């Protein structure tokens, strides 16, 4: 029987713009089904489901699920472990395309990380995603009680500190959509990153918070998500769109896709700016100085905020023509626990420092150079065609081609025409157009009046949240298992210890022989006596002082023959990160009786280098906008 793709995709309200809307006639059905598969995997614990569970979760026929999974596996977007389907790090290239086009993580993450270090609290950056907020950067603290949200997680606006700040710019249509979602999903079941609501709050409460945010210029989350969690947020605005009387905070992106920023409208000063700081004393000073109108703005804005009237609060605060300026590009938040800060304490102790960091972020945006577009993806259409020829009906070419359209975007390529997308991917205009129609229906791309298209934050719903926490051992493990199966010897991954004189094994795969190296994860050995250790030590600045390490650096591998233990031979190569630093090493360990050292290098070293290349490729994708833990 035919699968009901529309209903399966729309259950969480994420697959279509406004719930279960009719699928356009020109939409690519296999592409919609593939998006549904990726979203169900994203929502699953650990980013994995069995094929049977995936069949139930999507409502698709088992044969359809098998073909979609086979195609996604060919693209390295998922991997099969027996009958289980796991999201794979390569899938993060879709979310990376959105984050690169946005530019904000690259420009502002350093400031957020520095603030987290200064305050010893978690700091996040979020963008608005319709009636929710979605994280684009997280700088978390390691504590027994720490923040568990991930880059790409979607939260309902009303249960967060950033939400009211984004809601200030909502239109009546936006508010209507929010009310509809609240009525249809009162417990927030569509937001898997959150625990379900225990008590349903009144809509008027969020409206009051948004009206207050229009006046204060900041917002607070006092344990709205769960007991103990508190946060304070301040908006980051595009250059020239501050809280100026007569201009204010406008809707729209504020971002000129592909070129930079909205036009600079200047930084005016008035009573609204004082109100934005929550400075009542400042308003009184303005009145004392003869600025009665400015003082009235403050009082009127606060009165409207108390009534929950967002639009009138903005007007009273001096917002003026809300369509005439740029918008908030993201919101910066400091997140803490009530054991360290109460909600009032956040305002008094942390708000000034958060404001200072946001001011520095806005300066960085003002002085940011134009984006420099990198090379677009090449040969994708040829690759999909070749895969179809090789795999036949098990490869769903329309799914693969449709997903490659998302990779056409990136830094300096934030807004693209249909022709540019077709040229970048190698697709025909007709194929690219149908893919864009499908992605627009799924909420992944948005058209603009100038006939260009841009990615939306919803692209991050395709696997990014669970994969953003992927560690290097998790990346390496399936490749080590494959390597051990090919060469029939034990394979392992290791890093240097904090002291630098030992290695620590972080992942391994057994070779299946009677005589094989049996070292458990967590084992530590002297670095100088192991092939893994010598590869890691050879990357240090002082390595040239040692002839042994100098040779390892020159040859790109290390061979240790019965030095650590009689009969044990090992060869190792480095694993490098995006910056070219050696962060780990992989090795093959075997019994010395199974051939000469020359035979070992001839038979094993090429396989080992190939495995390291695969690990590095996935590490580069996973580490572009996320920290990848090495242990």
Task: Give a label for each model feature.
Residues 237-242, 324-328, 576-582:
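Flexible loop/coil segments at beta-strand boundaries within sensory signal-transduction domains
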Residues 90-117, 147, 458-486, 504-505, ...:
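Conserved segment of winged-helix/HTH DNA-binding domains
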Residues 2-12, 18-98, 363, 382-464, ...:
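N-terminal helix-turn-helix
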Residues 227-235, 243, 566-574:
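A short beta-strand signature within small-molecule sensing/ligand-binding domains used
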Residues 124-130, 137-139, 493-499, 506-509:
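Short hydrophobic alpha-helical segments used for membrane anchoring or interfacial signaling
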Residues 112-124, 480-488, 492-495, 549, ...:
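Short regulatory alpha-helical segment in sensory/regulatory domains of signaling proteins that mediates
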Residues 145-227, 506-566:
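Short, solvent-exposed recognition segments
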């Amino acid at each position: 029987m035919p699968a009901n793709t529309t209903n399966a995709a729309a259950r969480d309200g994420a697959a279509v713009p406004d719930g279960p809307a009719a699928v356009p006639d020109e939409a690519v059905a296999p592409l919609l089904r593939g998006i549904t598969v990726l979203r169900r995997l994203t929502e699953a614990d650990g980013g994995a489901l069995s094929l049977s569970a995936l069949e139930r979760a999507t409502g698709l026929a088992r044969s359809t699920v098998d073909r979609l999974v086979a195609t996604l596996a060919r693209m390295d977007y998922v991997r099969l472990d027996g009958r289980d389907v796991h999201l794979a790090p390569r899938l993060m290239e879709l979310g990376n395309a959105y984050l690169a086009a946005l530019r904000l993580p690259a420009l502002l993450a350093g400031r957020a990380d520095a603030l987290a270090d200064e305050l010893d609290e978690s700091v996040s950056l979020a963008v608005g995603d319709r009636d929710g907020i979605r994280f684009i950067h997280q700088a978390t603290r390691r504590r027994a009680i720490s923040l568990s949200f991930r880059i790409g997680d979607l939260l309902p606006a009303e249960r967060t500190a950033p939400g009211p700040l984004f809601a200030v710019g909502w239109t009546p249509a936006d508010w209507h959509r929010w009310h509809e979602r609240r009525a249809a999903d009162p417990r927030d079941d569509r937001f898997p990153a959150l625990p379900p609501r225990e008590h349903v709050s009144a809509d008027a409460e969020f409206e009051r918070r948004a009206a207050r945010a229009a006046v204060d210029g900041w917002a607070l989350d006092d344990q709205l998500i769960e007991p103990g969690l508190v946060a304070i947020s301040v908006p980051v605005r595009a250059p020239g769109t501050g809280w100026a009387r007569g201009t204010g905070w406008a809707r729209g992106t504020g971002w000129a896709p592909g070129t930079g920023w909205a036009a600079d409208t200047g930084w005016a000063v008035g009573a609204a700016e004082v109100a934005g700081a929550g400075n009542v004393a400042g308003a009184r000073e303005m009145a004392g100085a003869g600025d009665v109108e400015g003082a009235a703005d403050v009082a009127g804005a606060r009165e409207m905020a108390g009534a929950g009237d967002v639009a009138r609060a903005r007007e009273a605060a001096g917002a003026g023509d809300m369509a005439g300026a740029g918008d908030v590009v993201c919101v910066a938040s400091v997140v803490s626990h009530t054991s360290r800060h109460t909600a009032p304490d956040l305002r008094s102790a942390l708000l000034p420092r958060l404001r200072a960091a946001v001011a520095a972020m806005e300066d960085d945006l003002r002085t940011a150079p134009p984006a420099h577009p990198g090379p677009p993806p090449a040969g994708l259409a040829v690759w999909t065609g070749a895969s179809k020829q090789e795999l036949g009906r098990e490869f769903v070419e329309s799914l693969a081609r449709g997903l490659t359209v998302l990779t056409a975007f990136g830094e300096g390529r934030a807004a693209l025409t249909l022709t540019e997308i077709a040229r970048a991917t190698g697709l025909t205009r007709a194929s690219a157009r149908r893919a864009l129609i499908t992605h627009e229906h799924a909420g992944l791309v948005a058209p603009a009046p100038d006939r260009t298209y841009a990615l939306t934050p919803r692209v991050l719903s395709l696997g990014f949240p669970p994969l953003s926490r992927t560690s290097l051992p998790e990346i390496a493990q399936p490749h080590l298992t494959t390597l051990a199966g090919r060469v029939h010897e034990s394979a392992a991954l290791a890093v240097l210890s904090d002291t630098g004189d030992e290695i620590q094994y972080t992942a391994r795969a057994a070779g299946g022989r009677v005589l094989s190296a049996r070292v458990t994860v967590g084992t530590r050995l002297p670095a100088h006596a192991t092939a893994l250790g010598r590869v890691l030590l050879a990357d240090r600045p002082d390595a040239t002082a040692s002839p042994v390490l100098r040779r390892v650096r020159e040859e790109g591998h290390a061979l240790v023959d019965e030095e650590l233990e009689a009969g044990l031979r090992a060869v190792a190569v480095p694993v490098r990160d995006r910056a070219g630093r050696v962060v780990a090493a992989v090795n093959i360990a075997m019994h010395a009786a199974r051939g000469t050292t020359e035979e070992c290098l001839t038979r094993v070293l090429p396989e080992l280098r190939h495995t390291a290349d695969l690990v590095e490729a996935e590490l580069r994708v996973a580490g572009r906008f996320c920290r990848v833990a090495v242990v």
